[in-house]
Every structure is written in structure tokens, then in C-alpha cells.
Regions:
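Long, well-ordered, tryptophan-enriched scaffold segments
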Residues: 266-370
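A glycine-rich phosphate-binding loop feature that marks nucleotide/adenosyl-phosphate handling sites
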Residues: 163-164, 310-313, 367, 410-421, ...
Length: 811
């Protein structure tokens, strides 16, 4: 796929860039895009005059980038939003420019569906029928129900559901184990713990078995690379803002001229106009591709044998750990000398992945002959049922070629980021030591005491003693919208004898809020004071001081006030432990003083407040994962049992022998390929022939911003389908279709495009569920989780939400 100039003098890359941007501009319609930005800004300034003030805020939703916003406020209303305009805007010290989501935040602040008053449910869960109540009644009821559950069942029956709507906050942070809700519960005897995330369950679990952690080189280090290979990594949509890494990817490649290969079932926006080659692959088969590449590397003597001998365990017989079976090493597995007796040739890999044999061989030689090579993976490939094997397998490519711990190389993980470490609101120690995977909370409601350590991944004890009876849900949509199998989840939550109380604290009547027993209106982050750091932002760290843009409207309250009032009702000792006598602003001042004590280069509190944003480049230039280990493995061992890279993991071998697994589940000490349920070769494909996976969509961050009209208009919810599959079904581009399987049905327009592999379909995840749950349950909002499964992955017990089989028909 050449980037040479066409006869008219326009390169393919330039053409794709210009048409993609132009299409978005036309689709966006009412959005202010860069073409008219200065003119619009001047018009606003002229119209508002001297009565307008500018307040620094931030978008702190879970794309992770956390971009600065400059909110123009007049008469206590946000009338205009712009973004960071500080500094010289040069590479390494650039302006943190928000994407269209952050720039549309005014429409979220003033949305007609904002929650304004505390309410209690009067209909059935999910019907969305509520009546307004006073804050006193709401807080008294909440405290009484919490006391009752703890008295009857114990603190293990209380659970803080996974949520990431304000993942960037500090005082306002929603991440369950680090939220103010967790602090409150830890002051009141604790609550059932959770581990893992919906974003990274498999990779965060798997990579530490190889490296002891999950680090990768920063994207900026690509300026030292000769080759970039991206497995399912799509920063142009997942990290698309100026606070994200797309800018770094482009700028670093401008400096290195590194060739970039994108391996993905979908021709993503990261690929379009940027890549040198797109290699489409069947979902869930990346580990087979890696094995086919490894066969070529080994047989053509392209592996870095000295690196493997010095730094690794389990590559061949001489580095195999004690207790491992003969020929239990990785080299034997690849050459067909292991238990299965199958050589992982490129021909073998081609049948599984759908990639031509010749292309696998060519890719292997490119990787083996290009050093340094930046080989990375996004979080999509690991969000499969066999994702933990995929994550470890992709890491084998930099391991085999000795690209770990060097500039321009990588570990095979997703990119790491330089951040300015902030002092978080302390959540205190949780007295309850039992934990479940964050994905299995519906199981813990439905069959809690049946859940065990060896079958369900319960940690801290052999089994749960009680089911979940009280559910907190703060700034999250994972009760329904972002959790799997919505119809099954609905049935579980409908039974009020199971989970007795659900408390939702949010800004909108989300799909999850409809299931609340008590529904409390929270302030947005731009309506209260907080200090947040960057994340996923290359090698420039920054802090943003958020100040309230407007006063609190109606009866909306900040989360710290809500929980402080609950703490009062739980006892004076609980209130004192929770607040320590501080207001929200006093907590910020206290925590920031601790930061400055550790990092004197930071500006003073009042200076940061005045500046709005503070930036600092990584003093080491680029983050290089495991650099110290590479330089001196004896002085800087990894956090693995051997202190080395563990290609063969004795810990995984022990787990595989002890845990209870289904016949189609695999836990292996080696990074092997394994088929899985609802994979490309599942017999169920005779009924549901299309694989379906989700992707992060530009119009939303998960479900955040999913109710903003202009973003919905700019980026319609569609199902991607290849022209070959569409033709078989009589489907044309734009046709309304039904996507369905044994779990549910959604309806939405079809996007017929060669940008998706045949036999595969894809939908943007996070669309708001919209179905008549007392009727046909057809989801006209087209939330992908109407179609996904509750069945967790074997090792991490995490969400396999990209492993699905469906069919598509024209309506």
C-alpha cells in the first residue's frame, strides 16, 4: 500500500487525511471546528463583552487524557468553551487541546435531562419511575438501609460498583477502590473488594506473569524506532485529543520515519492515512499470528539468543525452570515438539487468522530485521475470552528479538505515560479482605455464597459468605449499559429480594440510574474545585486546577458533601474519620502541600489556581520500560519469582493444575494460542456466523457524552459490515438492520465498508440502551452489551466483551 504521489500530486496519505477531516467537519454541522474557531471566538468575545469571566476546568472522563478547558461564563452560565492556549505549542510542550467531546461540555452542563433533585423509586427497577424527595429523607433512608444491611449480613454484603465516569478526579474520583465512597465505607467497617477493570482485566492480569508489571515505552520514544507494529491499538479514536497520544505518535514518526504496520480486524482512524500497511486479522487470533511469526524467527535464526539466555526463563530447555515438563518450553511449543505436536508454521497460523501465509513470513522478517522495533498492543485484543494468552503472546515478539528495555523498542504492552504524581484523597485500609473480579458482581448478587476461589476467582477466602445486598454506584453506568448481557442483568436486578438497595449518584438519568432505589444528583467536575493530573499523555505531564464555573443549580450537591452527610448519620466517629474536620477545599490544600513537600518544583497552590494548567516534560526524555533491568538484571531484577522475564510461568502452571475450568477454557504457563467460546471456529457460527467486537467511538467516552445531540449527529451509531457479508444478506449502506444472537437484539443502520474484515462485524461501544423491558426488549439505542455475555475469562475472570457471535438481517 504505497504512499507515493498520485499523477495529480496528492499522496494517498494526504488524501485520506484531508477527506477524513472534511467528512467530520460536514457531519458535525453545528460544532465549531478549527476552520471557524477564531472567528467564532471573536464573535463570542464581542457579544459577551467585559462581563464574561474565564474559568479553568477539565474533561475528566475515562478516555484518560484529561484535557484542559477554558470555560467562558456570563450570568452564572457557561456560554462558550475553548481549550488550552498556553505555551509555545511545540512538540514536548504542546497545548493540551480538548477534542470535540470536551469542547461540547456546555451541552452536558446545560442538558435538559440533568438530575436536579434527590429522588426515590416508585416503579419497578428499570422503569425509570421516581418521585422527588428532600435531601434529609434521601440521606436518612440511605443511612438506615446501609445500617440494616451491615447489621443483618455484615460488611461483605456491601459493594461499590465499578465506575469510571470521573476517573480523572481527586476528591471527585469515581474509581471504586480510590473513591470517596470507598473512604466512607472503610470508615464504617469496609465493603467487598474488587480487582481488575473493564478496560484492562486480561492484560493487567497476564503481563505481570511475564514481566512482573505491565509497563511499556512512552509513545514519544517512537522517534528512536525503525519499525512500529500495533496490535489493535487505536489512539486516534481512544486517545484522540491533544491530551492524548495521537499527537506524539505522529510527531515521533515524523522524526524517525519509522514504518508503521497496523494489525486489526478494522481499518481504524489510526491506520487511515498514517499507516504503511494494514493487516486485517480475525478477532481473538493474535496469539496464532505471533506463533507463526515466531516459527519464522526461530527457523531463520532471527531471534536474539544472547538476550533470551541472559534475561529470560523458559525459552528453551536450558532456561526451563525446575518442575516444568521436558519440552515444556516455548521453542518446543512453536516447533511442534511440545504436548500438542503441532508445528506453528505460517501456514498453520494463516488458516486461523485469515492472513495470507506469505504476509506472515514477510512480517516476521520485518520484525526480525528491524531494530529497534516498537511492538505494542491496545486493550481491544485482550478484551477477548482468551485475552490473557493474547497479551502474553504479543509480548513474545519484542522478547524474541531483544527489543525490551531499549530506546525505540517496547515490551509489547500498551504505551506508558509520564505523569506528575499527585497526592490522592486517602481511602484508608479496607477491613474486609475478600475480593471478587469487578466483572462478576452480578454473579455475587445472584449466587454469592456459591462463588469460590478456584472456580470464580474469589480472593481472600475460599468462598463468599453472603451475596451482595447493598450496591453503591457513583459516576458510572456499569449497572446496565457498560456491563454484559443487559437482559440477564435486568432479570437479576428486578428481584429485590437479592440486592436489596441500589444507590446511584450521577448527573443524568442513565440506563443504570433507572435501576436505582435512591437517585442522588451530583455536581459535574467543572462545577466544583479539584486538582487532576494527566494520564495517557506521552512524555509531558501536567496538572489542571479545576474551579467551579457556575454555582450549584437546583438541589445538586458535590459528592464530598453527600458522603459527609451520610457519615454524620452513621455516627460521630465515622464522620470525624471521614472528614478529619476538613472541607473539600481544605482537603485540596492539605494534599497539595504534601505534593509540594515531595516535589518542590511544583508551583504554589495559589499560583497553580491562577495558572489553571502546569506542564512538565519527562526529565528522562522518554520512558523506557525495564531499562534498568536490561542494563543490570542482577541489581534491578523484575518483580517475577525468578527476577527475569518469565516466558514459562510456574505460577500459571500451578493455577492451571488447581483451578476448576470448563472444557473450552485454557490457562497455560506458556503464551500459547487457544480457541475459545464464541470464537471464529465455534460450531455456534452455523447459527450466528459473524464475529462481533466493539470499539471506542469518537462521539463518546464509553457512555459519557452519549446523550449530547451534536455528537450523536456527527457520529451515528452504526454496525460495520463487509460488502461481501452485506451482499449475501441484501444489505446496503445505511439500511436499518437487526443485529442479534441468543442474548438479545439491537437495531441500527448498517455501515457497509471494506474497512472491516469479511466474517467480522463491529459496533461503537457505549451507546445508551433503549428498550421496552416489559415488551420485546429490542434495543433501539443499539448498546452492544445487549449482545455480550456474562461468562468471564478463565484467568482474570474479566469481561470478554469482544468475543461474540451474531447474525445481521435487514429490517
Amino acid at each position: 500500500m504505497s504512499n507515493q504521489e498520485s499523477p495529480g500530486g496528492v499522496s494517498r496519505r494526504a488524501l485520506l487525511k484531508s477527506t477524513a477531516l472534511g467528512s467530520l467537519a460536514l457531519a458535525a454541522g453545528g460544532l465549531t471546528l478549527p476552520f471557524t474557531l477564531r472567528r467564532a471566538a471573536a464573535a463570542v468575545q464581542q457579544a459577551t463583552g467585559d462581563t464574561t469571566r474565564i474559568v479553568w476546568g477539565a474533561c475528566s472522563v475515562n478516555c484518560g487524557s484529561r484535557c484542559a478547558l477554558r470555560l467562558h461564563v456570563r450570568d452564572d452560565e457557561v456560554v462558550y468553551v475553548e481549550t488550552d492556549n498556553t505555551g509555545d505549542d511545540r512538540y514536548g510542550d504542546h497545548q493540551v487541546r480538548a477534542c470535540l467531546r470536551g469542547r461540547s461540555i456546555r451541552r452536558r452542563i446545560n442538558h435538559p435531562d440533568r438530575l436536579n433533585y434527590p429522588m426515590k423509586r416508585v416503579g419497578k427497577r428499570g422503569e425509570g419511575k421516581f418521585v422527588r424527595i428532600s435531601w434529609q429523607e434521601a440521606l436518612d433512608t440511605l443511612a438506615d438501609r446501609l445500617k440494616s444491611v451491615v447489621a443483618q449480613y455484615g460488611n461483605e454484603a456491601v459493594y461499590i460498583n465499578y465506575s469510571s465516569g470521573i476517573v480523572g478526579g481527586n476528591i471527585t474520583r469515581s474509581s471504586p477502590s480510590a473513591s470517596p465512597v470507598a473512604r466512607l465505607m472503610n470508615c464504617y467497617g469496609g465493603s467487598l473488594n474488587q480487582y481488575g477493570t473493564y478496560s484492562t482485566a486480561q492484560i493487567a492480569c497476564a503481563m505481570p506473569y511475564t514481566y512482573g508489571s505491565n509497563d511499556g515505552n512512552s509513545t514519544s520514544d517512537i522517534e528512536n524506532s525503525k519499525l512500529v507494529v500495533m496490535f489493535g491499538n487505536n489512539p486516534a479514536e481512544t486517545r484522540m485529543s491533544g491530551g492524548g497520544i495521537t499527537w506524539y505518535l505522529e510527531q515521533a514518526r515524523e522524526r524517525s520515519n519509522a514504518r508503521m504496520i497496523v494489525i486489526d480486524p478494522r481499518y481504524t482512524d489510526t491506520a487511515a492515512g498514517r499507516e504503511d500497511e494494514w493487516i486485517p486479522i480475525r478477532p481473538g487470533t493474535d496469539a496464532a499470528l505471533v506463533a507463526g511469526i515466531a516459527w519464522v524467527l526461530i527457523n531463520e535464526d532471527l531471534v536474539d539468543q544472547p538476550f533470551l539466555d541472559k534475561y529470560c526463563v523458559g525459552y528453551d530447555e536450558k532456561t526451563l525452570p525446575a518442575g516444568a515438563p521436558a519440552n515444556g518450553h516455548y521453542k518446543a511449543y512453536i516447533l511442534g515438539e511440545g504436548d500438542d505436536g503441532i508445528a506453528k508454521t505460517p501456514q498453520w497460523a494463516s488458516r486461523i487468522t485469515g492472513i495470507p501465509t506469505e504476509r506472515i513470513i514477510k512480517l516476521a522478517r520485518e520484525i526480525g530485521m528491524s531494530k529497534p522495533a516498537y511492538i505494542c498492543q491496545g486493550w481491544g485484543p485482550q478484551r477477548q475470552a482468551n485475552g490473557k494468552l493474547t497479551a502474553r503472546a504479543i509480548a513474545m515478539l519484542p522478547i524474541l528479538t531483544g527489543n525490551v528495555g531499549i530506546n525505540g523498542g517496547n515490551s509489547g504492552a500498551r504505551e506508558s505515560t509520564y505523569t506528575i504524581t499527585i497526592e490522592r484523597l486517602p481511602v484508608l485500609e479496607n477491613p474486609v479482605k475478600t475480593a471478587i473480579s469487578c466483572f462478576t458482581w452480578t454473579d455475587a448478587i445472584a449466587r454469592g455464597p456459591e462463588m469460590t476461589a478456584s472456580r470464580d476467582g474469589v480472593r481472600g477466602k475460599e468462598k463468599l459468605d453472603v451475596p451482595i445486598k447493598f450496591l453503591w454506584n457513583y459516576a458510572g453506568n456499569t449497572i446496565i449499559n457498560q456491563h454484559s448481557d443487559i437482559n440477564k442483568t435486568h432479570e437479576i436486578l428486578q428481584d429485590e429480594s437479592k440486592c436489596e438497595t441500589i444507590v446511584v449518584i450521577d448527573n443524568f438519568m442513565t440506563s443504570s440510574a433507572k435501576y436505582a432505589d435512591l437517585l442522588l444528583p451530583d455536581l459535574m467536575t467543572v462545577e466544583q474545585e479539584d486538582i487532576i493530573p494527566n494520564d495517557y499523555a506521552g512524555n509531558m505531564g501536567y496538572l489542571i486546577f479545576i474551579q467551579p464555573a457556575t454555582s450549584a443549580k437546583f438541589e445538586r450537591k458535590p459528592i464530598y458533601w453527600i458522603l459527609s452527610e451520610v457519615a454524620k448519620r452513621l455516627g460521630d466517629d465515622v464522620h470525624q474519620r471521614f472528614t478529619e474536620g476538613r472541607t473539600q477545599e481544605q482537603w485540596l490544600q492539605y494534599l497539595y502541600a504534601k505534593m509540594v513537600a515531595k516535589d518542590p518544583a511544583l508551583p504554589a497552590y495559589e499560583d497553580l489556581k491562577r495558572m489553571g494548567i502546569y506542564k512538565r516534560k519527562d526529565p528522562n526524555g522518554h520512558f523506557v520500560a525495564y531499562r534498568d533491568f536490561r542494563r543490570d538484571p542482577e541489581a534491578h531484577p523484575l518483580k517475577t519469582p525468578s527476577g527475569k522475564i518469565e516466558i514459562y510461568s510456574s505460577r500459571l502452571a500451578e493455577i492451571a493444575a488447581r483451578w476448576q475450568l470448563e472444557k473450552d477454557e485454557v490457562i497455560s504457563p506458556l503464551p500459547v494460542y487457544a480457541s475459545t467460546f464464541e470464537g471464529w471456529d465455534d460450531p455456534l457460527r452455523s447459527q450466528y456466523p459473524l464475529q462481533l467486537f466493539g470499539f471506542h467511538y469518537k462521539a463518546r467516552t464509553h457512555s459519557s457524552y452519549g446523550n449530547v445531540d451534536v455528537l450523536q449527529a456527527a457520529c451515528r451509531q452504526e454496525v460495520w459490515i463487509n460488502p461481501l457479508d452485506a451482499e449475501k444478506r441484501g444489505i446496503k449502506n445505511g439500511d436499518m438492520v437487526r443485529v442479534f444472537n441468543q442474548r438479545g437484539e439491537v437495531r441500527l443502520p448498517a455501515k457497509v465498508t471494506p474497512r472491516i474484515m469479511p466474517g467480522v462485524s463491529a459496533m461503537g461501544q457505549g451507546a445508551w440502551h433503549d428498550a421496552n423491558m416489559t415488551g420485546d426488549r429490542i434495543d433501539h439505542g443499539a448498546c452492544m452489551n445487549t449482545l455480550t455475555t456474562h461468562r468471564p475469562s478463565p484467568l482474570a475472570k474479566g469481561n470478554p466483551q469482544h468475543t461474540n457471535l451474531v447474525d445481521i438481517e435487514k429490517v
